[in-house]
């Protein structure tokens, strides 16, 4: 099922932030939730996603977010079918404008109703993408054959407290470390980027939960700013780690102005993705030019 999901994402667009997304088959779409439900039935014998609370896979707050995001995508798809008078899952620009009117999104400051509707859509898709990533990582951890931790691997890379290895992935030992020193939120992304280490799903959840802390304290942390600048100016393409920082809500809290462009669309012939996704592509292209 995971291989099928990867193939589907490649077919319908590897980014969930395309201007005209496929509501059902696209990344962060309805099919991703259905895949999660199918796998959970096999792995945990659950009847619906709310049974995953008992299994300890999701927190109550996460299931609430997942359920609301799923409902929003389902209602969007229903409106799309009604407008098209046929089965149609491609949320094109004309349909976006019409659906935003039907749902009665209003003008807010400089945001048009369609921009507000699509921002809500992209946030729902981002929530689904982030939470299904956690689910699939937990499944992988729980059901893969237990492999003895490679002693050579562990000694090749030295980690200092509060960072530890958990199934060959970097993790933070306890939440209290973040509460006392929020700058380690940026530090773990820095380590992940430069040492090619995946971040453990439980830690991704923790980072998302604590992301607002850096909004309050990052101004006085010169080290956080320094680490972030090292990431975006490094000899390794930073697009992937920046996306992960965005998915965990860290980037928008670390750079408050960036939060305003997350999920923001521009309906013109030059933009095929949301503004935040175009920003990641621009940084990636700058890296490619620098290394030609």
Label every model-predicted segment:
Residues 1-271:
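Non-catalytic interface/linker regions that flank or bridge core catalytic/transmembrane domains
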Residues 268, 273-277, 287:
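Large, well-folded core regions of big proteins
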């Amino acid at each position: 099922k995971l291989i099928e999901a990867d193939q589907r994402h490649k077919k319908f667009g590897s980014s969930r932030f395309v201007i005209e997304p496929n509501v059902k088959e696209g990344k962060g779409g309805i099919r991703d939730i259905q895949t999660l439900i199918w796998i959970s039935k096999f792995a945990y014998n659950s009847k619906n996603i709310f049974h995953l609370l008992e299994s300890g896979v999701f927190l109550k707050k996460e299931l609430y977010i997942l359920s609301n995001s799923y409902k929003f995508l389902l209602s969007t798809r229903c409106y799309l079918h009604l407008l098209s008078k046929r089965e149609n899952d491609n949320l094109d620009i004309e349909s976006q404008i019409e659906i935003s009117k039907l749902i009665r999104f209003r003008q807010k400051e400089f945001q048009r109703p369609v921009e507000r509707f699509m921002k809500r859509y992209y946030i729902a898709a981002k929530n689904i993408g982030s939470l299904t990533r956690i689910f699939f990582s937990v499944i992988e951890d729980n059901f893969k054959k237990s492999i003895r931790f490679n002693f050579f691997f562990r000694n090749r890379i030295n980690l200092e407290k509060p960072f530890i290895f958990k199934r060959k992935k970097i993790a933070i030992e306890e939440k209290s470390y973040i509460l006392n020193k929020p700058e380690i939120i940026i530090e773990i992304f820095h380590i992940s980027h430069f040492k090619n280490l995946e971040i453990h799903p439980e830690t991704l959840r923790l980072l998302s939960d604590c992301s607002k802390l850096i909004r309050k304290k990052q101004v006085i942390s010169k080290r956080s700013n320094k680490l972030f600048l090292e990431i975006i100016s490094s000899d390794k393409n930073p697009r992937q780690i920046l996306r992960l920082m965005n998915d965990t809500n860290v980037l928008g809290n670390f750079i408050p102005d960036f939060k305003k462009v997350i999920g923001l669309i521009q309906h013109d012939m030059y933009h095929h993705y949301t503004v935040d996704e175009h920003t990641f592509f621009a940084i990636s292209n700058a890296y490619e030019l620098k290394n030609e």
